């Protein structure tokens, strides 16, 4: 029995050490927490993380890495930093979870988990979200289906005009929003104080 456990420990150690990998992406920082979901159907959890630099376009706004070897599955550009943590739900019924991630400049994106193609963008390129009083989207959370489309919907906060000086007391309000996960449309929106 002692040899069984010794051999088991040895083979588990070899298997676990073979699963280590690292990946390097040039010229971005991240405040996004890495999240995992199987995006390529191989049974191994893959890693999704947002990135970028405040107020700058990034070619590496959101990246998905293969959980087996750390190779890049796909990446998407972003008009500003994506600092939210991804959540996952199969929105296009292909059997693979899709990615919802958020960040500055009212970026809230739904991305096909398998291909990396954009499913919807709350504020597409070429629009100025601040003109509508919307600023940063923070970490999204799923809630029960509100709009009756059989998909869990998104509860998310929006606010924080970080370009305003810290001493400015007359700030635009924040919003607590319910967003359709299927198409990115606003279902409900409530004004909340912003500090």
Give the location of each predicted region.
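A short beta-strand motif characteristic of beta-propeller blades
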Residues: 19-26, 71-77, 117-131, 185-191
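Beta-propeller blade termini
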Residues: 32-41, 50, 84-91, 138-146, ...
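Hydrophobic beta-strand segments that make up the repeating blades of beta-propeller
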Residues: 47-51, 99-102, 154-158
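A short loop-to-beta-strand structural motif that recurs across blades of beta-propeller domains
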Residues: 60-63, 107-109, 174-177
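Beta-strand-rich domains and repeat architectures in extracellular enzymes and scaffolds
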Residues: 23-58
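Repeat-based blade/solenoid architectures
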Residues: 24-34, 77-86, 127-141, 191-195
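Short glycine/acidic-enriched loop and turn motifs that connect beta-strands
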Residues: 52-57, 105-107, 160-165
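Glycine-aliphatic tripeptides that mark coil-to-beta-strand junctions in extracellular
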Residues: 43-45, 72, 95-97, 150-152
């Amino acid at each position: 029995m002692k040899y069984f456990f010794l051999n088991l420990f040895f083979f588990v150690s070899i298997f676990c050490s073979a699963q280590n990998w690292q990946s390097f992406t040039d010229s971005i920082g991240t405040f996004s927490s890495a999240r995992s979901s199987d995006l390529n159907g191989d049974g191994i959890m893959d890693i999704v993380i947002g990135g970028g630099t405040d107020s700058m376009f990034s070619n590496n706004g959101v990246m998905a890495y293969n959980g087996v070897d750390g190779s890049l599955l796909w990446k998407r550009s972003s008009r500003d930093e994506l600092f939210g943590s991804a959540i996952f739900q199969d929105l296009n019924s292909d059997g693979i979870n899709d990615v919802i991630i958020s960040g500055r400049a009212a970026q809230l994106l739904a991305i096909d988990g398998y291909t990396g193609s954009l499913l919807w963008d709350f504020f597409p390129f070429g629009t100025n979200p601040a003109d509508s009083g919307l600023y940063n989207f923070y970490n999204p959370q799923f809630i029960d289906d509100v709009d009756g489309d059989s998909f869990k919907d998104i509860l998310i906060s929006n606010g924080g005009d970080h370009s305003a000086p810290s001493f400015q007391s007359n700030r635009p309000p924040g919003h607590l929003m319910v967003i359709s996960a299927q198409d990115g449309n606003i279902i409900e929106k409530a004004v909340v104080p912003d500090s």
